[in-house]
Amino acid sequence: MAIFEERPHGYTERAESFGLNLKMPQQKGKLELLYLRPLDLSVDETMQEILDAIERVGAKRLVIDSLVGFEMALAPGFRADFRESLYRMISALTGAGITILSTVEVEDTFDAMPFSHYAISFLTDDIIRMRYVEIDGQLRKVMVVIKMRGGNHSKDIREYVITDKGVVVIGPRSTDYEGLTTGIPKRTGPRTAQGEEAAPEPKAKP
């Protein structure tokens, strides 16, 4: 796991609060948290660090958290051609049989929905979009599968919560709103009567 925005100890502790135990696989030599932010490397040097870690643990999966942090961790002279360098790195890793999961923080307004400012969706097989939306005066979280190369997938926009047991997707998709992907949806279903308290936020099942 290549991380760029948080030190391994803090990353491990925060993951544990979400019900994800990273300590045990690290102790067993099955997982390595590779903190590359302070090294100021080129893309080729970064890839070599990652390949060395993959070889040490015999990994078949790599998490890059995040691409924004990855770019900022590079020496300034290598940021201009980040997209091309990233393409070479991903091609080399997938060619070696490594499955890659990467996160991208997207800064946008509520009325926009870009996938990423890197325009690298062509590199990916699958894209899951997660964002906040405003519903009844509350910020809630929704997710939607944007792309699944080579297969069909659900088109539903689903609400989710993050608990101490991990990510929990809530109930059936909502049909009471449209425009959820804008972050400011419009209600299409029945409203609560004036003066009535709005329905509480759905709770995750234990």
Feature roles, as predicted:
Residues 1-2, 11-13, 22-26, 60-64, ...:
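Extended hydrophobic-aromatic, low-complexity segments
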Residues 1-45:
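Conserved P-loop
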Residues 5-6, 103-106, 149:
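A short beta-strand-to-loop transition that corresponds to the Sensor-1 phosphate-sensing loop
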Residues 10-15, 49, 119-123, 144:
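Alpha-helical scaffold elements adjacent to nucleotide-binding pockets in ATP/GTP-utilizing enzyme cores
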Residues 20-28, 119-123, 161:
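Short, conserved catalytic or adaptor-binding loops enriched in Gly and charged residues
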Residues 40-123, 127, 135-137:
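P-loop NTPase motor core
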Residues 48, 52-57, 61, 125-126, ...:
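Conserved P-loop NTPase
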